[in-house]
Amino acid sequence: MTSIVEALVPGGKANPGPPLGPALGPLGVNIKEVVEKINEKTRDYNGMQVPVKVIVDDKKNVEIEVGTPPTASLIMKELGIQKGSGNAGSEVVGNISISQVAKIARMKKEDVLSYDLKATMKEVMGTCVPMGVTVEGVEARDSQKALDQGKFDDLLAGEEW
């Protein structure tokens, strides 16, 4: 029987404690070795929470799948902030450029249901709203409308999805 352990771990800094250790212990695998592999695969996401899936088969073979961090974490890393606004309607904690939004959208390509870059960018902008982050100096919802109206089409020209 194959067992699957899913967890959100700090990029490059997973440890044998919770949530991994208690979940992997009963499966009889070398926890230290698994944690080292996870840290190796997630080191590029240092400072962010990263979803990982550890798949252990009957013969104790381990496969590790690493997802991309949540969109909010990517936005915070891009802006260099620790957290979003506690009062999103009236407090702005940062401003993100349309090229940064596109960069995050490309990172999330494998994890979203959108069919193109423009739709994924709208999802990223939607995450900016409750965080108190503006896009190109205006509220994220207004930037979504501008994207729909073609204001940023020059940035998207020739983009393969």
From Swiss-Prot:
Entry keyword set: Ribonucleoprotein, Ribosomal protein, RNA-binding, rRNA-binding
Any one Gene Ontology cellular component term annotated for this protein: large ribosomal subunit
Stored SUPFAM superfamilies: Ribosomal L11/L12e N-terminal domain, Ribosomal protein L11, C-terminal domain
GO molecular function: large ribosomal subunit rRNA binding; structural constituent of ribosome
Bilayer-crossing regions: none
GO-annotated biological processes: translation
Keyword Ribonucleoprotein: yes
Disulfide-bond pairs as recorded: none
Keyword Nucleus recorded: no
Secretion signal, residue range per the UniProt entry: none
Quaternary structure, from the entry: Part of the ribosomal stalk of the 50S ribosomal subunit. Interacts with L10 and the large rRNA to form the base of the stalk. L10 forms an elongated spine to which L12 dimers bind in a sequential fashion forming a multimeric L10(L12)X complex.
Function as written in the Swiss-Prot or TrEMBL entry: Forms part of the ribosomal stalk which helps the ribosome interact with GTP-bound translation factors.
Similarity remark: Belongs to the universal ribosomal protein uL11 family.
Cross-referenced HAMAP family: Ribosomal_uL11
PANTHER family to which the protein is assigned, alphabetical: 60S RIBOSOMAL PROTEIN L12 (PTHR11661), LARGE RIBOSOMAL SUBUNIT PROTEIN UL11M (PTHR11661:SF1)
Name recorded for this polypeptide: Large ribosomal subunit protein uL11
